[in-house]
């Protein structure tokens, strides 16, 4: 193992950010500090009402007093905003834009693409609501509409503010509408009755909790439902850690053949599968190796409610889950076989043994605590992380539906901005690392201390299983030396189990700065989860 420390000068003060999903408190009508609100001041006030304290900016020549530059900045956001839409992450995009007066002669201003509507047209496809804040008669209502949609649907919204409209004052008094949608009472009552009947008639019910349980703040309700009626629980890979994985009712991640066979067997033998907030995606379903009988399923999400083959409309997801917990049903204690629940296996380090992917994840499992959050990228680092045991809820982040490479390092930055008491354990392949590694410079600037573990298997290993070729090879960087480039942090190069043990201990001890561990792996060495999937598909294809 080689290790090196890079140093830098004094660190600037960090910018902290926290966005909560609470309902907004009502702002003071059209007044701001005793003055009439402008479009810009009202937007800032409403962001604060929703708990927003800081903004992430895109570099550029800002065309007004907001963060994202027109087109060159805004369009750079498209891939990440598309991922947020797909995976239901509430994000507010605020973009500056040329002034309305400047547009009158249709000038070819720099940053413009086709016309002055191009950027907004693009974002309409990947957000749940968009608005051009160009009219003080409508801008305040449009701000409220978009922010409410962001919170209600847990998806991105886009606000475009021309630079000559920032200081336009309210024309008429405006008070936010705090009314909330309600469920159809008859549909809610009948859906609960059918769900109760199906659950009570079952001998082996099981819950599969998905990411929407976290997105909509329903973890306590779902856990309370499981505990009240003694129903075992699983999670999807996108919803992994939605509950503590050390909970006695927790079985593991269900994802068809990619998950442990014991979990797959238990779930697929169930006569009542209760899917709550679960995306039925190819990754969540183990590349469609999962087998669930719709006639035996209760399927509830923010967009759909189906009990067996009966569909119910106008039932709000949170209303259904909350009411389900309050139902009166018989309680049956069900024995969970010991081999189904996740177990941490003991292993002994062989110092001279070349490190393997399996051993790497076994080692990572040993260092996870209540103060760590696992952030994993796309590829075998994601599949291997399925078997990690996350002991505290909501301590696992991944793009397991949209699966855009390069997610993990920027996401770890966001995670630590939101909660600096957590230390990110970042799992990233060498290919994904090369896409977004320079965000480590921002982490260093803010004084953050992620531990970045690079699975250096000399290219796109997951793709090699699909089709081998030179297009899967990438430049062989000395990943641990990036700390020299950015001017701070520790770098470690690992080839053996002994190297790995020393590097992890040193990185954990280095609490004041980031660490990058470059783990050399064979190009053909893959995680147990990917091995399980390959084995299953080889028998069925």
Regions found by a protein language model. Give the residues of each.
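Glycine-rich, acidic loop regions that bind phosphate or pyrophosphate groups
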Residues: 95-141, 161, 239-340, 458, ...
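Thiamine diphosphate
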Residues: 94, 104-114, 219, 256, ...
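Glycine-rich, anion-gripping cofactor-binding loops and their flanking helix/strand elements
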Residues: 69-70, 211-300, 391-422, 434-438, ...
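Structural signature of the thiamine diphosphate
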Residues: 20, 53-54, 68, 73-95, ...
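Phosphate/pyrophosphate-binding active-site segments
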Residues: 15, 21-34, 134-137, 172-173, ...
């Amino acid at each position: 193992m080689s290790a090196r420390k890079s140093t830098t000068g004094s660190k600037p003060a960090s910018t902290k950010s926290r966005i909560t999903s609470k309902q907004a408190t009502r702002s003071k009508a059209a007044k701001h500090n005793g003055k009439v609100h402008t479009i810009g001041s009202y937007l800032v006030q409403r962001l604060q009402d929703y708990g927003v304290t800081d903004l992430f900016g895109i570099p550029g020549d800002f065309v007004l007093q907001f963060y994202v530059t027109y087109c060159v900045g805004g369009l750079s956001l498209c891939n990440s905003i598309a991922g947020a839409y797909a995976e239901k992450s509430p994000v507010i995009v605020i973009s500056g834009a040329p002034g309305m007066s400047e547009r009158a002669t249709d000038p070819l201003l720099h940053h413009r693409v086709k016309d002055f509507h191009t950027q907004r047209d693009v974002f309409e496809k990947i957000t749940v609501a968009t608005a051009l804040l160009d009219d003080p008669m409508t801008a305040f209502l449009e701000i409220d509409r978009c922010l409410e949609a962001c919170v209600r649907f847990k998806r991105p919204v886009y606000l475009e503010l021309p630079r000559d409209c920032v200081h336009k004052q309210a024309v008429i008094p405006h008070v936010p509408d705090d009314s909330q949608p309600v469920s159809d009472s008859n549909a809610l009552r009948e859906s609960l009755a059918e769900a109760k009947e199906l659950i009570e008639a079952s001998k082996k019910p099981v819950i599969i909790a998905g990411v929407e349980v976290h997105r909509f703040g329903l973890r306590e309700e779902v856990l309370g439902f499981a505990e009240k009626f003694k129903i075992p629980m699983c999670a999807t890979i996108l919803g992994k850690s939605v509950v503590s994985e050390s909970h006695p009712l927790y079985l593991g991640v269900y994802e068809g053949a990619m998950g442990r066979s014991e979990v797959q067997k238990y779930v697929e033998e169930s006569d009542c599968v209760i899917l709550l907030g679960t995306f039925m995606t190819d990754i969540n379903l183990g590349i469609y190796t999962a087998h669930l009988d719709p006639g035996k399923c209760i399927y509830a999400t923010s967009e759909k409610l189906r009990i067996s083959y009966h569909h119910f409309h106008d039932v709000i997801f949170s209303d259904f889950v909350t009411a389900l917990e309050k139902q009166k049903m018989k309680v049956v204690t069900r024995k969970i076989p010991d081999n189904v629940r996740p177990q941490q296996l003991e292993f002994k380090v062989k110092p001279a043994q070349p490190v393997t992917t399996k051993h790497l994840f076994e080692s990572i499992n040993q260092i996870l605590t209540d103060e760590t959050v696992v952030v994993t990228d796309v590829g075998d680092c994601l599949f291997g992380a399925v078997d990690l045991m996350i002991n505290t809820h909501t301590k696992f982040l991944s793009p397991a539906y949209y699966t855009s490479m390069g997610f993990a390092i920027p996401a770890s930055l966001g995670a630590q901005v939101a909660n600096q008491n957590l230390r990110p354990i970042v799992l990233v392949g060498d290919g994904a690392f090369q896409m977004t590694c320079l965000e480590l410079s921002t982490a260093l600037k803010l004084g953050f201390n992620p531990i970045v573990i690079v699975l250096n298997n000399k290219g796109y290993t997951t793709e090699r299983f699909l089709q081998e070729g030179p297009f899967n090879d990438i430049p062989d960087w000395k990943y641990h030396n990036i700390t020299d480039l950015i001017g701070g942090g520790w770098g470690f190069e690992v080839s053996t189990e002994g190297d790995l043990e020393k590097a992890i201990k040193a990185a954990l001890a280095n609490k004041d700065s980031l660490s990058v561990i470059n783990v050399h792996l064979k190009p053909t060495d893959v995680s147990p989860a990917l091995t399980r999937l390959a084995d299953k598909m080889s028998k069925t294809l």
